[in-house]
Amino acid sequence: MADVTVKQLAQVVGIPVERLLNQLQEAGLSFTDDQQTVNEEQKRILLNHLKGSSNRDISAAPERITLRRKSMSQVTVGHDMHSGKTVNIEVRKKKTFIKRSAIPEQAEIEEPVVPPVVEEPVHEEITVVSEVSAETPELKETEEHPVIEPVAELDETVKEEEKISLEENTAESQDELTHANTDVIENLVDVVEEAIPASKKEEVKPEKVSKKKHLEQTDSDISEFKKGKKKPKYHTFEHDEEEQELHRRGGRSKFKKKKGTEKSDKYREAEETLTHGFALPTAPIVREVLIPETITVAELAKRMSVKAAEVIKVMMSLGAMATINQVIDQETSVIVVEEMGHKPVIIKEDAVETGLGEAISKGTKTEGRAPVVTIMGHVDHGKTSLLDYIRRTKVAAGEAGGITQHIGAYHVSTPKGNITFLDTPGHAAFTAMRARGAQATDIVILIVAADDGVKPQTIEAIQHAKAAKVPIIVAINKMDKPDADPERVMNELSVQEVIPEAWGGDTMFVNISAKSGMGIDDLLDAILLQSEVLELKAVTDGAAKGVVIESRLDKGRGPVATVLVQSGTLHKGDILLAGFQYGRVRALVSDNGDLVDSAGPSIPVEVLGLSAIPHAGDEAVVVPDEKKAREVALFRQGRFRDVKLARRQKTSIEGIMENMTATESKVLNIVLKADVQGSLEAISDALTKLSTDEVKVEVISSGVGGITESDVHLAIASNAILIGFNVRADGTAKRLAEQESVSIHYYSVIYDIVDQIKGALTGMLAPQFKEEIVGIAEVRDVFKSPKIGAIAGCMVIEGVVKRNNPIRVLRSNVVIYEGTLESLRRFKDDVLEVRQGFECGIGVKNYNDVKPGDLIEVFETVEIKRDL
């Protein structure tokens, strides 16, 4: 082995560097740094020193617990009871337990050669001196090998005597004594068997061995151990031969049979694997912990092989409160596992989803498809009006307030080709709907009014388009107005990194007028040109796959979902799976209201027959059978519920403090019903954003469809406001609302809902009060009155002094008293107020320490109107 540094040698040996340096210095070698080199000669000197010190330590180490014992026994050796010879055995035992900071590796000890025992008369005795070694994490016993020697003849009637001297009586030492006593018996029997010749040992009957019974019962701990009161520790790992030699010599079991007890060889072999020691791991064990999407604290602790209390401690140190049966999410589990030093392995329980992908039939026939174009822009910039002109319809006239509040999907056939348009809302509350529109589209048309320029929703639409990596075509609308300024629009868009082609960019700009039709043909040409560049293709003969654009609950037809088919062909009668919902397609309705039998790629249709309303933005796919659809839907529902529960239970220390302060805040409960899912999400999000630290909006229930009796009951129980957006209450709900005096608010424009709720929250705000100084009087002289006390003769130097107003007395600009103005007189007449420049007498209630030169400040408290 080549020369190594002290640090490398310590790593090879497996001990700390400081300890190795100490050992080198004790061996007479001058080593002070862990980077010094150790050669072969120095290693040999260190090894000889350690061997010598090991032998010295056995005899010179300080004793902690000393055990001495002497016992007498007899063993009959021979063919039978009458012809055999009796050998007297005297056992002397001594054990010393030594405290060690680190247990060195035990040197292998050669087995001593035992001289044969010569058969003697009946009264001959054998003395066995045995020292037993048992190893524990903190205690080590010295070991002396058994020696057999003849001793003088003793009386057979001498009883067994034990002398136990304990220097320290601890529970730890008692356990060691129990194991040591058992090993003494084992060693005794082993020595006797080795001393008996082989020919004689085979002839010994099993019954004669039972005469060692009183030897086995020399200690109460041994008897309790054998009776099962003290259970042995089971070691589940495989032992090497050295460890087995240490714990059981001669291949015999530690546990001896009692008289009359029969055990099979198989059971005896099983007992041989039992050990009494526990070895601490030398290095921390790093485990790979499999983490699903949700897991309980107890299960996570089990996978790390630690107690659940340890996991809870770590979570509390990270600022999260948890219980042993609480479900935590995957993100929290990963942080906890990494904090405890293990390696997290994230697993996705999507075997059902994977099976779904394999079960779906995939087509091979690809054809060109129509582009899906989303019209986006700021509110009132003419998005729907442009679509009206292209479709030659009046969509905008049917929208409440002329504002689009749903995603409209339309398939338009033009002389230049087929195009599918998605019309998104422009209001700030419909951010999620615009994001869904951008994800399902191929091209985005950005409408900007020439007379209004770039607005917040315009910038947001640009961000959505860039996030979805969709090309943008800018349509500058309202060019027929006299104040139209397209150059201004181009300059403002260039700030948002939308550069026109005329300026060297890659974005097409088209000037249009949705009212007169100017530039519409140029816009359609630009759309078709961009679609040719994209080379849009789709599979037409496989299972249909698409996205849910919008969903609503129709009173006569049930759940209705607007689905944009992206690939394959959707047929009437197919089993459609959309998010958590599934069902057989009962009918397909086109955007014109016509019933159709199938829909290909880029075609929007309304689907009837789903089990419930799917969420807007969910993926819709045709599955082979209803059984598979039900399995996947139930799996998704369960996973969503688990994740939602885990997030709800994720309470941090900061969250507890927030909840403590939130109990003082006022809450406005709302029961919300809307006509479509997209509007419901937009309104809920807009109302929730109105919350402040003092007042909060909580949508306790929301749904798609009309207002029912259960909604009214919920509003009564929770003292909530009942809001219907483009829906109405049925007859039963109306009657119940009238009886219970519950007002139902109907709206058709989202602005009105936001304004109304904002006003209600403003009224719930706690009032604020402000002190306004109305007058200041200077004390010129002080008079005594028998009824009132001290009267201050004052001159009003500022404002008005009013009677019964609160006052402050200032001396050298320091407030020395605050009270109420009790008496106000002018020329012996009581007056209500005294204006600036007039003299008056002021009596201060319960205060007589007024002095000339003081200032009396008169103020009043004014309530300030608050706003959100």
Swiss-Prot record:
Composition bias type Basic and acidic residues, residue spans: 199-209
Gene Ontology molecular functions: GTP binding; GTPase activity; guanosine tetraphosphate binding; translation initiation factor activity
Disulphide-bonded residues: none
Positions of GTP binding: 377-384, 423-427, 477-480
Keyword Nucleotide-binding: yes
Domain of life per record: Bacteria
UniProt-recorded name of the protein: Translation initiation factor IF-2
Gene expressing this chain: infB
Region G3, annotated ranges: 423-426
Compartments, as annotated in UniProt: Cytoplasm
Region: Disordered, residue numbers: 199-269
Region (G4), start-end ranges: 477-480
Summary of the function given for this chain in its UniProt record: One of the essential components for the initiation of protein synthesis. Protects formylmethionyl-tRNA from spontaneous hydrolysis and promotes its binding to the 30S ribosomal subunits. Also involved in the hydrolysis of GTP during the formation of the 70S ribosomal complex.
Renumbered residue ranges of the record's region G5: 513-515
Sequence segments annotated as region (G2): 402-406
Entry-linked InterPro entries: DNA-bd_dom_put_sf, EF-G-like_DII, EFTu-like_2, IF2_assoc_dom_bac, IF2_II, IF2_N, P-loop_NTPase, Small_GTP-bd
Region span, G1: 377-384
Signal peptide boundaries: none
Pfam families linked to this entry: EF-G_D2, GTP_EFTU, GTP_EFTU_D2, IF-2, IF2_assoc, IF2_N
Domain tr-type G stretches: 368-537
Organism: Legionella pneumophila (strain Paris)
Keywords, sorted A to Z: Cytoplasm, GTP-binding, Initiation factor, Nucleotide-binding, Protein biosynthesis
Family (UniProt): Belongs to the TRAFAC class translation factor GTPase superfamily. Classic translation factor GTPase family. IF-2 subfamily.
NCBIfam families found in the cross-reference section: IF-2, small_GTP
Listed GO CC annotations: cytosol
Biased composition (Basic residues): 249-260
